[in-house]
C-alpha cells in the first residue's frame, strides 16, 4: 500500500509536468473520475448516521457499556493531541520565527477558525482564511495566494495526527501487536495519505481505510470510530486551517514582510484597506 501511495504521488507530479495534448486529455479523464468518485462518497456520507447507529447499537448489545470507555479515551486523546499541536507548538513557532505575539495572530484568525470548525471543510473556509491572513495579519497577497491554496491540499496537520491515533486505536481494539516498525509505517502512511485527502467533511475516513489495509486490518474496522468522527472532524479542520495560516505568516516574515503582525487587528484592517484602495486608484490612473 505504501508503494502505491508513493507511485501515485510520482505519477501525479510527472503528469502535471506533461504539457502535450495527450497529457491534458489524461488529466481531464482523471479529474472526471475524481468528480464522480467524490459524488459517490458524498452519497455514502449521507447515510453515515444510519450506519453509525446500527454499528453502535450492535456493539453495545454484544458488550454492554464497557465498549464506550475506550472510545471516550480515544476521543480525549485526539482532542489533547490537537490542542497541544495548535496551542503549544504552533504559538512557539510563531514567536520564534516571527518575533511577534502569537495571540495577535490567533485574534486575527478567529473568523476563519470558527468557519472551519462549523463547516469541517478547509476548501470552504479558504476564501475567509485568505482574507483574515491578508487583512488582519498583514501578509501580502502574493505570499498568501500561493501558500494557502497549496496548504489547504498538502498541509493537513490535524488530519495526519488524527489518522495516526485512529489507526493505532483500531489496531489495539483488534488485538494487533504494534511493533516499532509497524508504528513507523503508520506514521509515514498517514503523512502521505493526508497530502491527498480532499478538503471536505469526513474525507479522512477514506485515508484511514488505506492505513488499515497497510497494517492488515479490514476496512470495516473503521466503524469503531465513526460515532466520534463528526466532532473530531470539526476540530482537526480548524487545526488544519490554523496550521496553514501559521506557515503563511512564518514564510511571509522570512521573505522580509515587516508589516506581518506588526499592528493590532483593528489597525491592521484599516491599513490594509487603505493600501488596497490606493493600489486600485493607481491602477485605474495608469489605465486611463
Model-found features: residue ranges?
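Transmembrane alpha-helical segments of multi-pass membrane transport proteins and ion-pumping complexes
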Residues: 4-8, 13, 17, 47-50, ...
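Small-residue-enriched core segments of transmembrane alpha-helices in multipass membrane transport
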Residues: 33-34, 72-89, 108-114, 184-197, ...
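Transmembrane alpha-helical segments and their short flanking loops
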Residues: 164-288
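Membrane-interfacial loop-to-helix junctions in multi-pass transporters
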Residues: 1-2, 42-45, 81, 97-105, ...
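Signature of multi-pass transmembrane helix bundles
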Residues: 1-104, 288
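Loop-to-transmembrane-helix entry motif
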Residues: 33-47, 71-79, 109, 113, ...
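Juxtamembrane helix-boundary/capping and inter-helix hinge elements in multi-pass membrane proteins
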Residues: 18-24, 32, 63, 98-102, ...
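Helix-loop-helix junctions within the multi-pass membrane cores of secondary transporters/permeases
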Residues: 111-194, 248, 261-268
Amino acid at each position: 500500500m505504501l508503494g502505491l501511495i508513493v507511485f501515485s504521488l510520482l505519477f501525479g507530479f510527472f503528469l502535471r509536468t506533461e504539457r502535450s495534448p495527450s497529457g491534458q486529455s489524461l488529466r481531464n479523464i482523471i479529474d472526471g473520475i475524481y468528480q464522480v468518485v467524490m459524488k459517490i462518497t458524498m452519497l455514502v456520507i449521507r447515510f453515515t448516521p444510519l450506519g453509525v447507529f446500527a454499528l453502535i447499537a450492535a456493539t453495545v448489545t454484544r458488550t454492554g457499556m464497557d465498549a464506550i470507555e475506550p472510545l471516550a479515551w480515544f476521543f480525549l486523546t485526539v482532542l489533547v493531541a490537537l490542542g497541544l499541536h495548535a496551542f503549544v507548538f504552533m504559538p512557539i513557532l510563531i514567536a520564534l520565527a516571527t518575533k511577534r505575539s502569537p495571540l495577535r495572530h490567533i485574534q486575527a484568525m478567529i473568523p476563519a477558525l470558527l468557519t472551519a470548525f462549523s463547516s469541517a471543510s478547509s476548501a470552504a473556509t479558504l476564501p475567509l482564511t485568505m482574507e483574515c491572513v491578508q487583512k488582519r495579519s498583514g501578509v501580502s497577497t502574493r505570499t498568501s495566494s500561493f501558500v494557502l491554496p497549496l496548504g489547504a491540499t498538502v498541509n493537513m496537520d490535524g488530519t495526519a495526527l488524527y489518522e495516526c491515533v485512529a489507526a493505532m486505536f483500531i489496531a489495539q481494539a483488534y488485538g494487533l501487536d504494534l511493533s516499532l516498525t509497524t508504528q513507523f509505517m503508520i506514521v509515514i502512511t498517514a503523512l502521505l495519505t493526508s497530502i491527498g485527502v480532499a478538503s471536505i467533511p469526513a474525507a479522512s475516513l477514506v485515508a484511514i481505510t488505506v492505513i488499515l489495509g497497510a497494517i492488515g486490518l479490514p476496512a470495516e474496522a473503521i466503524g469503531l470510530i465513526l460515532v466520534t468522527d463528526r466532532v473530531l472532524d470539526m476540530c482537526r479542520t480548524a487545526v488544519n486551517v490554523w496550521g496553514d495560516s501559521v506557515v503563511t505568516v512564518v514564510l511571509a516574515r522570512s521573505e522580509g514582510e515587516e508589516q506581518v503582525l506588526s499592528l493590532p487587528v483593528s489597525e491592521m484592517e484599516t491599513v490594509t484597506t487603505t493600501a488596497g484602495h490606493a493600489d486600485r486608484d493607481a491602477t485605474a490612473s495608469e489605465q486611463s
